[in-house]
């Protein structure tokens, strides 16, 4: 057992006492836990947790799939970055690569972008992001395309397609030291194509 795991129940108890949540759901299922010899765990730790939760960030509404979504279903660490795009997107065409739930794309639409295209390789992510666009009344401004962002960027570059703003928020390309060089090439490629 990891020291962090040994304090898990203390954290749950503190959250219940201070925050009074409807439920707490554990997502200790990232692959790196296996590398560290830790068990991958998911499940309700307290109360009840619906399949989807609606949240609001910077005035934008999102459905979040806590149980099946990537990692926790929403990347809260990018909140300030999503807010920071506001002065750059009004009246602009925007491409959001690796869109996941559409968080950057929907913020761009909310902040007045003329047209937004979100790209993700996952059909599930694109469907979920499309639902989020409808939830915000942005379905006529924000659209999602299921595609490999590397391939799409290359195709659009060859075709001369241009966007006023390109957002790149890729997943981690490496989890191990041995893959660092390949990751560098990947990051360089997407930045050159953008």
Can you name each region flagged by the protein language model?
Residues 7-74:
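Non-catalytic substrate-recognition/targeting regions of SAM-dependent transferases
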Residues 47-194:
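Rossmann-like S-adenosyl-L-methionine
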């Amino acid at each position: 057992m990891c020291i962090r795991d040994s304090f898990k129940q203390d954290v749950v108890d503190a959250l219940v006492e201070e925050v009074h949540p409807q439920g707490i759901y554990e997502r200790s299922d990232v692959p790196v836990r296996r590398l560290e010899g830790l068990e991958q765990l998911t499940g309700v730790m307290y109360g009840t947790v619906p399949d989807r939760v609606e949240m609001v960030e910077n005035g934008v509404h999102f459905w979040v799939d806590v149980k099946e979504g990537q990692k926790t279903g929403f990347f809260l660490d990018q909140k300030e970055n999503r807010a920071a795009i506001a002065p750059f997107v009004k009246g602009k065409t925007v491409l959001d690569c690796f869109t996941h739930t559409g968080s950057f794309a929907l913020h761009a639409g909310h902040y007045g972008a003329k047209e937004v295209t979100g790209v993700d390789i996952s059909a599930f992510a694109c469907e979920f992001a499309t639902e989020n666009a409808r939830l915000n009344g942005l379905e006529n401004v924000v659209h999602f395309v299921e595609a490999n962002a590397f391939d799409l960027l290359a195709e659009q570059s060859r075709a001369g397609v241009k966007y006023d703003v390109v957002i790149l928020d890729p997943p981690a390309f490496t989890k191990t030291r041995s893959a660092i060089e390949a990751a560098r090439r990947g990051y360089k490629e997407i930045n050159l194509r953008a």
